[in-house]
């Protein structure tokens, strides 16, 4: 059963306060770190509840879910955070405002072509692999050159996204992501999820991707096609 709108609002308010506390402790201003509501596996009502609670950014891993839930939303930024399949680039460009998961030139070229055909600018982040268990992402060494190649194709590269390790030292991995971000440039370091966001903010994250912390566990359901 989806959480009540009031419950989502209470969780968002508590998270916003705590995110700001950690942000202030790093010497940055209140509000410097954005919260992205990850709605994967949750119904459209959850998306609307997050927006009603004052969040501006929502994110999905799967294109099909976004098609079902993200149509005709109130003003917001829709982020694609799943793996980019080149044959779905046109549909991704149509459904999202930001693509956080560009990890190779092939994907970037497909998105740039689709954005050009649609006559629109597309913001993207370079996904960087900082975890030995993560399947996707450019290496830290490859990422700056990839960012320049993407910019040369007309994409608005606004920073870096990374997924922290499930074991090992997250602080070291987060520091590596920040180092890449400083070389790539932009305004967005999308780093940190429900289980590790505080450490990510301390490492310099400017956007945390929170799903369980806002909505609770995802309901059991059949696998959604990408």
Where on the chain are the PLM-derived regions?
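Conserved alpha/beta-domain cores
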Residues: 1-188, 193-195, 201-203, 215-217
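Conserved catalytic-core subdomain
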Residues: 202-203, 210, 215-226
